[in-house]
Regions:
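Binding-site signature for planar aromatic cofactors or substrates
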Residues: 1-218
Length: 218
């Protein structure tokens, strides 16, 4: 359930929209006893470290939002030690197309939104927080660089980005189209491959038997 997420994002205009469309009383009842802790439980931490991608939203000084996809091996997005009662995320930011839109936006507005998807199980985790960018060449951050560089990003690490979490929310599974990674499909198809191998071997044995019978042509 939301942890300080709706509290941070429910502005006066949002309240007005909820009132207009009739959801305000239900929202108030639903959020009456919600926890406002900004730290992840083991469930969120496990979900985050299992992801191989996420979407990062930033806003430029001209007011335009920007959405970027970030990907890597499972575990490239790290849950670090909490700071002042807030969970902290971190990842090694690699050299990409060198437009630096997200990095430039963060220089003037450190607030970010992250969306983490598990398409196979129709789950998504929304996170908001404040980001801090550290140049990977700066001295004094060797420990953080080593930690965020695991499990081995395929590229040149230019920056270390950490996010102090302000709130998060598990979203409902409605309208999430199931999609599967190559590894997930491989596991699911393993019995099919085994059965296919067995049938091929059985077919080959029958062909050999037929070939050995006089007057029979396989």
């Amino acid at each position: 359930m939301p942890h300080r997420y709706l509290q941070e994002l429910t502005t006066a205009s949002v309240v007005a929209a909820q009132q207009r469309y009739g959801s305000r009383p239900a929202i108030q009842r639903m959020t009456a006893n919600w926890d406002t802790d900004a730290t992840f439980s083991d469930e969120e931490a496990a979900f985050i470290t299992e992801r191989d991608s996420f979407y990062l939203g930033t806003v430029g000084e001209n007011g335009w939002p920007y959405l970027q996809h970030r990907g890597g091996p499972p575990g490239f997005l790290h849950v670090l030690d909490p700071v002042d009662g807030h969970s902290v995320l971190g990842w090694a930011d690699l050299r990409g197309n060198r437009q630096y839109l997200s990095v430039g936006n963060l220089a003037t507005s450190p607030r970010v939104s992250l969306l983490l998807m598990d398409y196979a199980h129709q789950r998504r985790l929304k996170i908001i927080g404040t980001a801090h960018v550290t140049d990977a060449r700066d001295s004094g951050f060797e420990g953080l660089l080593a930690r965020l560089s695991a499990p081995g990003p395929a590229g040149r690490v230019e920056r270390l980005i950490t996010v102090k979490v302000q709130g998060y929310d598990w979203n409902c599974p409605q309208h999430i189209t199931p999609r599967f990674t190559e590894a997930e499909l491989s596991d699911a198809l393993a019995p099919v491959r085994d059965e296919l191998a067995r049938l091929r071997a059985e077919n080959q044995a029958l062909r050999e038997q037929a070939r050995q019978q006089p007057g029979r042509t396989p």
